[in-house]
């Protein structure tokens, strides 16, 4: 059965750790904003019917992004957290669809990783992730408590891919219980689901700090595959 697939891009964050004068999704790499690089990945994919972008209601920058005028893109206003922004986006998406949630500040996603995720047959959804390679320490303040077994640890990436109606229900349940939702998979986990891990590429980085910009620009320069 063919699935109806909608992408959601939460883009209402302020990116305070970037120490920049504007939200990080509007910083430029190769003469395009980070948001434009991200949107182009999904606009180019034939299986994605629509993209819903959640922006801050007071955001003065998004009207200047010409790509947001695409007929495939719908703008909604975000909420107080990333999870609330995603939930607001889900309100304009049909329950019988599947939703693909991706960070606005991950412009280096490869088409091959996106295809691999979309081909997953996990009925409760799946996420891109990378196995932990570094030694992982459990801390108490700035002191090491012990070393974690990294063999079962993964770094969660995006996109994250779920049946829309299940993700809506999971977010509502998490909000009602005042749980901290750091990504969509965590909301699904709180509701008892076990989304599948799909091994992705480590160059699908999230631009968070100033030093990430040069690395992202390098990856984009090398990335001839969308």
From Swiss-Prot:
It catalyses: 2-C-methyl-D-erythritol 4-phosphate + CTP + H(+) = 4-CDP-2-C-methyl-D-erythritol + diphosphate. Keywords: Isoprene biosynthesis, Nucleotidyltransferase, Transferase. The record marks 17, 24 as: Transition state stabilizer. InterPro entries: IspD, IspD/TarI, IspD/TarI_cytidylyltransf_bact, ISPD_synthase_CS, Nucleotide-diphossugar_trans. It holds the Pfam family IspD. GO terms for biological process: isopentenyl diphosphate biosynthetic process, methylerythritol 4-phosphate pathway. CDD domains: CDP-ME_synthetase. Pathway: Isoprenoid biosynthesis; isopentenyl diphosphate biosynthesis via DXP pathway; isopentenyl diphosphate from 1-deoxy-D-xylulose 5-phosphate: step 2/6. The keyword Ribonucleoprotein does not apply. One of its GO terms (molecular function) is 2-C-methyl-D-erythritol 4-phosphate cytidylyltransferase activity. PROSITE patterns: ISPD (PS01295). Belongs to the IspD/TarI cytidylyltransferase family. IspD subfamily. NCBIfam families: ispD. It is an enzyme of class 2 (transferase). The record marks 150, 206 as: Positions MEP for the nucleophilic attack. This is 2-C-methyl-D-erythritol 4-phosphate cytidylyltransferase. The keyword Magnesium does not apply. Coiled coil: none annotated. Its EC number is 2.7.7.60. Catalyzes the formation of 4-diphosphocytidyl-2-C-methyl-D-erythritol from CTP and 2-C-methyl-D-erythritol 4-phosphate (MEP).
């Amino acid at each position: 059965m063919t699935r109806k697939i909608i992408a959601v891009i939460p883009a209402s964050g302020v990116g305070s750790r970037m120490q920049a004068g504007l939200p990080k999704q509007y910083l430029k790499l190769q003469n395009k904003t980070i948001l434009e690089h991200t949107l182009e990945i999904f606009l180019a994919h034939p299986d994605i019917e629509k993209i819903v972008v959640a922006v801050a209601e007071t955001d003065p920058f998004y009207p200047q992004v010409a790509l947001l005028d695409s007929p495939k893109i719908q703008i909604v206003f975000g909420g107080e957290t990333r999870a609330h922004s995603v939930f607001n986006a889900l309100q304009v998406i049909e329950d019988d669809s599947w939703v693909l949630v991706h960070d606005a500040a991950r412009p280096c996603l490869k088409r091959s990783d996106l295809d691999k995720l979309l081909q997953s047959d996990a009925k409760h959804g799946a996420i891109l992730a990378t196995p932990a390679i570094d030694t992982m320490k459990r801390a108490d303040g700035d002191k090491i408590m012990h070393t974690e077994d990294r063999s079962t640890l993964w770094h969660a990436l995006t996109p994250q891919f779920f049946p829309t109606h299940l993700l809506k229900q999971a977010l509502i349940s998490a909000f009602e219980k005042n749980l901290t939702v750091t990504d969509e998979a965590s909301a699904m986990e709180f509701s008892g689901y076990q989304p599948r891990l799909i091994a992705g590429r480590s160059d699908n980085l999230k631009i968070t700090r100033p030093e990430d910009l040069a690395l992202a620009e390098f990856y984009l320069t090398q990335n001839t595959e969308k």
